Amino acid sequence: NFNLSDSKTKVTKWNNDTKLLSSYFSGKTYGDIWGFETDRYFEESDFTGQNADGSWIYKSGVASQSALERAPFHYGPGDIKFKDLDGSGAIDGGKGTADDHGDLKVIGNSLPRYEYSFHLGGSWKGIDLDLFFQGVGKRSDWTIASLNFPMMRSADLAVYEHQSSYNRVFYSDDWKTITGYDINQGNTYPRLYPGNEAKGTVSGIANGSNNYYPQSRYLTDMSYL
């Protein structure tokens, strides 16, 4: 006994001529999640040095993410690097509309797809077995929570005070100057930094900023059996 169903809803007409991503608009698929496509972590080799204010100087050919920064944060080694999908040389969300969304893309959908159920049963020597299974084959969600993102909120500082970096930092002999970075691209999380739960500089998408803008890498898989 097996059942499978699927559905998808598209807006055919809506009074939103600007097609703002934060609202409904004609042609929008209901439940779409917009965000950036994660590339990797920044390496020290992506920069040529630092400015006096601590911001990093991007090497030629590396797309700048300075427009995404919420002060006093600056992108640097160990931080999330997003893909420059529109080839402009700078990462942004355009005007936050369907027609001008910069490097944003649909990274998932929050509605359940491929809902299924099946039943198994039988008997043997007077023993009856009856099993029912139910699940969703595909569903995504963008959620901001401390369990997903350690040290994302300022209140998490006390919990993770001894885990401020999952990357190695090299210091001078007097321990006063950072001389280099060893970035592990296999790390689960980027350089930890508090206060990322607030709204960033990009319009039309869910909350999250700096390393935790809505993005493909940290999209939550809500499928289940």
Can you say where each PLM-predicted feature lies in the sequence?
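Membrane-embedded beta-strand positions in outer-membrane beta-barrel channels/transporters
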Residues: 1, 117-119
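Extracellular loop and loop/strand-boundary signature of outer-membrane beta-barrel proteins
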Residues: 103-106, 215-219
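Conserved small-residue
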Residues: 1-108, 141, 148-152, 156-199
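Short glycine/proline-rich turn/loop motifs
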Residues: 95-101, 207-214
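Residues that define the transmembrane beta-barrel architecture of outer-membrane proteins
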Residues: 112-116, 221-225
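Mature extracellular/passenger domains of Gram-negative fimbrial/pilin and adhesin proteins
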Residues: 197, 201-209
